[in-house]
Amino acid sequence: MTKSELIERLVQKCHAVAAKDVENAVKEILDQMSFALESGKRIEVRGFGSFSLHYRQPRLGRNPKTGEQVKLDAKSVPHFKAGKELRERVDIYA
């Protein structure tokens, strides 16, 4: 599902709210989540999951085109861990 598809679905469910207001709300939520992660904070949405940053050590990589070794710097990457409720909802083998 894309951001625009999410906005469309929310507009269909919430007839009392203008489409532009829904779009602005979704954008603001995503902006606030991004700002929190930039600040090194953890985001927890109970029943859904949590977002945090994971540190990646510097390492040697390889250029796939030339095969040449390339030094990759350390970096932080976003990480999502699904909550128990979400894991149970998507578990088709349960």
Curated annotation (Swiss-Prot):
UniProt keyword DNA-binding present: yes
A GO CC annotation given for this chain: cytosol
Alphabetical list of PROSITE patterns matching this protein: HISTONE_LIKE
Cross-referenced SUPFAM superfamilies: IHF-like DNA-binding proteins
Gene Ontology biological process terms from the UniProt entry: DNA recombination; regulation of DNA-templated transcription; regulation of translation
Molecular function GO terms recorded: DNA binding; structural constituent of chromatin
Keywords, alphabetical: DNA recombination, DNA-binding, Transcription, Transcription regulation, Translation regulation
PANTHER family per record: DNA-BINDING PROTEIN HU (PTHR33175), INTEGRATION HOST FACTOR SUBUNIT BETA (PTHR33175:SF5)
Function statement: This protein is one of the two subunits of integration host factor, a specific DNA-binding protein that functions in genetic recombination as well as in transcriptional and translational control.
Quaternary context: Heterodimer of an alpha and a beta chain.
The family this protein is said to belong to: Belongs to the bacterial histone-like protein family.
Name listed for the protein in its UniProt record: Integration host factor subunit beta
Organism of provenance: Pasteurella multocida (strain Pm70)
Taxonomic lineage of the native organism: Bacteria, Pseudomonadati, Pseudomonadota, Gammaproteobacteria, Pasteurellales
